[in-house]
């Protein structure tokens, strides 16, 4: 058996983690023969709840799970990690300005970035889920200068999966038959879900999404707004934010980092924008279409960007620049 992979999940007493931990522990992410050490971090008031989560993981009697470490201390949580999945963040409370939310989270992710820098392996893969995910990820990256920038990514796979599902529902096909949708930009309501490079398998043949759907107005209108606002729609209906679908997206995201993307397919992830060929400003965590091989991602090059797409891509880049400026003001005053 290979050496255990050491994986941290933060916000481990929360509802996303509750759906996520079982998937990781039973081998859905790192493979069915890869032993694991799970490290669960949460804030001190959540430690009793976390004990219950540990009991349940023990009671699952999972053969791959070699050890579970529950802690409220960063020096314990970040020690010698292979993978860090940063789910925990300050949630937006009613009446809270986005600026206040950014300020609270800059503090958290600055501290966690510094802990990654100090205690984790330099090869650690860091996945940020806690919102605002892109800017939280950039904050952690800036606070961990000894870890390569390329090791940081943030979750836009939930948006990617939502986009696939919407096209599949529209055409009454399996979501696996929809390939190469793209989420550009921020994991927020300015994101740009782009179907212009997507294909759909119909009767064994791959057809462009626009040709398959035969409804350009929907693909340039209702499809985009549905994906952009899906998180809010789930909260309105369920009175809680997406957890099961978020956990599934995290599993997809990390599994693709670990094992690579299938030939001819790309996925969406927020990564550092340095050196991109799509006119996105440098030094942002921006969601691009990527292929992954040997645990290394590459932005898909050469996709044609029409005026409609350009405008949408610029709007979300502008929001990310504004967020970054606000976050960095707080960072420098910390």
From Swiss-Prot:
GO CC, sorted alphabetically, is: cytosol
Primary enzyme class: oxidoreductase
**What keywords are annotated for this sequence in UniProt?**
Cytoplasm, NAD, Oxidoreductase, Tricarboxylic acid cycle
What is this enzyme's EC?
1.1.1.37
GO MF, one term, reads: L-malate dehydrogenase (NAD+) activity
Q: Where does substrate bind?
A: 92, 98, 131, 162
The record's annotation in SUPFAM superfamilies points to: LDH C-terminal domain-like, NAD(P)-binding Rossmann-fold domains
**Location relative to the cell:** Cytoplasm, Cytosol
Q: Which residues form the active site?
A: 187
The record's section on InterPro entries has:
L-lactate/malate_DH, Lactate/malate_DH_C, Lactate/malate_DH_N, Lactate_DH/Glyco_Ohase_4_C, Malate_DH_AS, Malate_DH_NAD-dep_euk, Malate_DH_type2, NAD(P)-bd_dom_sf
**Residue spans crossing the bilayer:** none
> Self-association or partners: how does it assemble?
Homodimer.
Q: What does this protein do?
A: Catalyzes the reduction of aromatic alpha-keto acids in the presence of NADH. Plays essential roles in the malate-aspartate shuttle and the tricarboxylic acid cycle, important in mitochondrial NADH supply for oxidative phosphorylation. Catalyzes the reduction of 2-oxoglutarate to 2-hydroxyglutarate, leading to elevated reactive oxygen species (ROS).
Q: What is this protein called?
A: Malate dehydrogenase, cytoplasmic
Source organism of this protein record: Xenopus laevis
